[in-house]
From Swiss-Prot:
InterPro entries according to UniProt: AAA+_ATPase (IPR003593), ATP-synt_VA_C (IPR055190), ATP_synth_F1_bsu (IPR005722), ATPase_a/bsu_AS (IPR020003), ATPase_alpha/beta_chains (IPR050053), ATPase_F1/V1/A1_a/bsu_N (IPR004100), ATPase_F1/V1/A1_a/bsu_N_sf (IPR036121), ATPase_F1/V1/A1_a/bsu_nucl-bd (IPR000194)
The protein's name: ATP synthase subunit beta
Record organism: Streptococcus thermophilus (strain ATCC BAA-491 / LMD-9)
GO MF annotation: an example: ATP hydrolysis activity
Protein function: Produces ATP from ADP in the presence of a proton gradient across the membrane. The catalytic sites are hosted primarily by the beta subunits.
EC number: 7.1.2.2
UniProt keyword ATP-binding present: yes
């Protein structure tokens, strides 16, 4: 194990000089430095560049407070390695695998895996066409998720990405069991804390590993924490042959941290100030999130859209890797429709008659046609009013508004805020409900009865309570 000395500290960037003739650490190797002689505080650095003349430039995974020139740095000889396997379930830890849930740390002999790995080879991959039921009507009907697929939840600030992810964790864990890995990348610590206690109360935590590198962490930790979560998911997939759910909130923060690191390393910025290696970094992460013949990883990734601009390089680069996209729209939140999923902008590779079946496909496409026609008629309605529409279009507008409201539902995880119990709606009931609305069976019921309900029976009961 070779050792060097700190030559320079500039924020999270630390230059380490090794003696001439010593073996230099490889790129991505973890280096360890202790801030005092008692070794009470350890800081891990990751090698990013070799500057020549025995000097390497590293990125710190923790705050560099207390580091001084001349401190000894040890090369561990391998990348950052984190605990994997059943010991991680029910635990909360950071990018380095150190526990942060105030419980006993992992044992020294716990199995560990390096966070930097190659993606599975082409012949190891598996293609699945099985639908993953979420219990959320708008998703299951119009943009269904594939088991072993990649899903992106796109949306600007405050439109409900994290709440939707929390509801998906709740529904999938309660209804399907299985193992989940939640990775918090550069998001609010408060949300992570809420999620942890919620999972603890519901018992879901026993089948979940949680990894956090939140907003207050240095860019190195925020950039690498997604790889830590992914490494744990890969172990369950490859060694234990499990079907794993990997939740990442938020992929944009991974890109943002990469941009900070790139600037700190002195690289020339690319479009909109992002790192020139944006597509490569995203590809290296996304290509590892896949399903093999041994097991599957279904990933659900929240993706922040800066200023609601979908052409921004960060969300645009992520788009290319996804099977399903769920787009959250601010206009729908203003109308009080939650989840604020845009039924026309969201899409899925799984929405085909071969995968979801003829009836589901026919109902979904007809729902989209009705909503699209309603969108086209909105300008006419705004200028001339409803009276100028043909009888056929008036009927269509009424059904479109009922469909739009029926796409909303109460969430279990939001019950403490709304006071309304959440609902889980099986796919078959979702398809039946929308089919009956399209057939005109509920044209006589008020539009308000369709807002924030579960299955179609709830609409009838709500209308009855309203006196219809």
């Amino acid at each position: 194990m070779s050792s060097g000395k700190i030559a320079q500290v500039v924020g999270p960037v630390v230059d380490v000089a090794f003696a001439t003739g010593d073996k230099l650490p490889e790129i991505n190797n973890a280096l360890v430095v202790y801030t005092d002689e008692e070794k009470s505080r350890r800081i891990v650095l990751e090698v990013a560049l070799e500057l020549g003349e025995g000097v390497v430039r590293t990125i710190a995974m923790e705050s560099t407070d207390g580091l001084t020139r001349g401190l000894e740095v040890l090369d561990t000889g391998r990348p950052i390695s984190v605990p994997v396997g059943k010991e991680t379930l029910g635990r909360v830890f950071n990018v380095l695998g150190d526990t942060i849930d105030m419980e006993a740390p992992f044992a020294d002999d716990a199995e560990r895996e390096p966070i930097h790995k190659k993606a599975p080879t082409f012949d190891e991959l598996s293609t699945s066409t099985e639908i993953l039921e979420t219990g959320i009507k708008v998703i299951d009907l119009l943009a269904p998720y594939l088991k072993g697929g990649k899903v992106g939840l796109f949306g600007g600030a405050g439109v409900g990405k994290t709440v939707l992810i929390q509801e998906l964790i709740h529904n999938i864990a309660q209804e399907h069991g299985g193992i989940s890995v939640f990775t918090g990348v550069g998001e609010r610590s408060r949300e992570g804390n809420d999620l942890y206690w919620e999972m603890k109360e519901s018992g879901v935590i026993e089948k979940t590993a949680m990894v956090f590198g939140q907003m207050n962490e240095p860019p190195g930790a925020r950039m690498r924490v997604a790889l830590t979560g992914l490494t744990i998911a890969e172990y369950f997939r490859d060694v234990e042959g499990q079907d794993v759910l990997l939740f990442i909130d938020n992929i944009f923060r991974f890109t943002q941290a990469g941009s900070e690191v790139s600037a700190l390393l002195g690289r020339m910025p690319s479009a909109v100030g992002y790192q020139p290696t944006l597509a490569t970094e995203m590809g290296q992460l996304q290509e590892r999130i896949t399903s093999t013949k041994k097991g599957s990883v279904t990933s659900i990734q929240a993706i922040y859209v800066p200023a609601d601009d979908y052409t921004d390089p960060a969300p645009a680069t992520a788009f290319a890797h996804l099977d399903s996209t769920t787009n959250l729209e601010r206009k729908l939140t203003q109308m009080g429709i939650y989840p604020a999923v845009d039924p026309l902008a969201s899409s899925s590779r799984a929405l085909s008659p071969e995968i979801v079946g003829e009836e589901h496909y026919a109902v979904a496409t007809e729902v989209q046609r009705v909503l699209q026609r309603y969108r086209e008629l909105q300008d006419i309605i705004a200028i001339l009013g409803m009276d100028e529409l043909s009888d056929e279009d008036k009927t269509l507008v009424g059904r479109a508004r009922r469909i739009q409201f029926f796409l909303s539902q109460n969430f279990n995880v939001a019950e403490q805020f709304t006071g309304q119990p959440g609902s889980y709606v099986p796919v078959a009931e979702t398809v039946r409900g929308f089919k009956e609305i399209l057939e005109g069976k509920y044209d006589n019921l008020p539009e308000d009865a369709f807002r924030s309900v579960g299955p179609i029976e709830d609409v009838v009961a709500k209308a009855k309570a309203m006196g219809y």
